[in-house]
Amino acid sequence: MAELTISADDIQNAIEEYVSSFTADTFREEVGTVVDVGDSIAHVEGLPSVMTQELLEFPGGILGVALNLDEHNVGAVILGDFENIKEGQKVKRTGDVLSVPVGEAFMGRVVNPLGQPIDGRGDIEAEARRALELQAPSVVQRQSVKEPLQTGIKAIDAMTPIGRGQRQLVIGDRKTGKTAVCVDTILNQRQNWESGDPKRQVRCVYVAIGQKGTTIASVRRALEEGGAMDYTTIVAALASDSAGFKWLAPYTGSAIAQHWMYDGKHVLIVFDDLTKQAEAYRAISLLLRRPPGREAYPGDVFYLHSRLLERCAKLADHLGGGSLTGLPIIETKANDISAYIPTNVISITDGQCFLETDLFNQGVRPAINVGVSVSRVGGAAQIKAMKEVAGSLRLDLSQYRELEAFAAFASDLDATSKAQLERGARLVELLKQPQYQPMPVEEQVISLFLGTGGHLDSVPVGDVRRFETELLDHIRVAQEEILTEIRESQKLTDEAADSLTEVIKSFKKGFAATGGASVVPNEHVAALDEEKLDKESVKVHQAIPAKTSEKSKNSTPR
């Protein structure tokens, strides 16, 4: 058996050397204690150095956000299941302000307000992390909104156009089609995405706040069937989630979108809906014992929405020229747009589309009330062809609504009023559009050219939509060059208008109304109608000559 060659002195020297070279890793950890917990709110003692909006770690890996920094304790919102958090448990500071992962890999995914995937498709490889509370672009970092963002909805693109970088509010009662308008807008970006041109491509973020799981699933299914999930991210805070998740969801979606905007990309974000976020923030504030204001909302509820929506912008060219377009949704009660939250958001945004219950029930869908809806960007966000054909549309519809109310009580109407009523009824029918069927802008121009140009006056109201559909099918097959010219030049030249008029006239000859009657106007009847209209206008505008009597002739002036 071999003898040991290591002596006791060698062992002693090795131990002494190791002990002398050992340096203990010491770190300072600030730990607090849960004083009370309930309704997703916890009060914690013993964290004197905590920052506002800092993440706190509760037992079991559950996170919370420090909101109230009081003298003796910290009020924190728990993000997740608070049932297992008990009084006396330890809480650790993380040293990190609330942030979420961002990057290209988020397209096509469904995440929660912490940026964690919830679609069962594995982890997401993030490019970076972005803080939720960041300063919005300043005045010098912005430029004016001048590029159109087509929604594919005729009534919006014609009368309340939206530009890239704009904030357009979609407001109305429940079940009036607010979500449908925004989903159609996302679907309409597919053609731009498939073009492969970064200047045309628009990435989309859909933020669902307090929605039912089935509602979010149906939206996702509609986007998948329309080929829109390739460029869309869904941030979901379910109705069953805590108030903290509903409060944070819009900021998470905005952070993901801002990452692309500052990278020079164009982004569209939908907040569905901010009413539920305000209600969640009200619940959090009341539980934290913050003083309530109007309708029990806290005093900073305006700032809650303004600092979110101010992030939507069209960046200056030296910052890449990216844009973030916002479509916030607000739900009203009994069409009351003068309530607290609706008026707040109306004052923050650049316009609103007001959807009305009565119009929706009459079958006018999208149920946009033209009189109340407005876009403060206006013609700057429209192509020239759309300006030409839709210039008089809002006025025509407003006059039609006034005459319609008057005609309900008047038995006898002059020819001009009857013509306006007939034209208005056809315009209303023309602006109706099925859900999930957005229309390219060049086809919208042709459709509106039909209505405002009077080409539908001889078509029965019940056949207007069929006439429009069949004419567009005919043009796609036989007159593709008209669509191509409008799409590429973005203008409707006199030559294009003349050729389009000839196409419509020839198409009318082969089109039969529901009863089998021809829609080609009789030239003789049309001339008589024109003469009748002229006479009516003469009656209105011509001065009536004063009748002079013999007595007046002989009388001398004083």
Curated annotation (Swiss-Prot):
InterPro entries noted in UniProt: ATP_synth_asu-like_sf, ATP_synth_asu_C, ATP_synth_asu_C_sf, ATP_synth_F1_a_nt-bd_dom, ATP_synth_F1_asu, ATPase_a/bsu_AS, ATPase_F1/V1/A1_a/bsu_N, ATPase_F1/V1/A1_a/bsu_N_sf
Enzyme category, top tier: translocase
PROSITE patterns on file: ATPASE_ALPHA_BETA (PS00152)
GO molecular function, one term: proton-transporting ATP synthase activity, rotational mechanism
Entry-linked PANTHER family: ATP SYNTHASE SUBUNIT ALPHA, MITOCHONDRIAL (PTHR48082:SF2)
Description of how the protein assembles with itself and partners: F-type ATPases have 2 components, CF(1) - the catalytic core - and CF(0) - the membrane proton channel. CF(1) has five subunits: alpha(3), beta(3), gamma(1), delta(1), epsilon(1). CF(0) has three main subunits: a(1), b(2) and c(9-12). The alpha and beta chains form an alternating ring which encloses part of the gamma chain. CF(1) is attached to CF(0) by a central stalk formed by the gamma and epsilon chains, while a peripheral stalk is formed by the delta and b chains.
This protein's name: ATP synthase subunit alpha
Species of provenance: Mycobacterium leprae (strain TN)
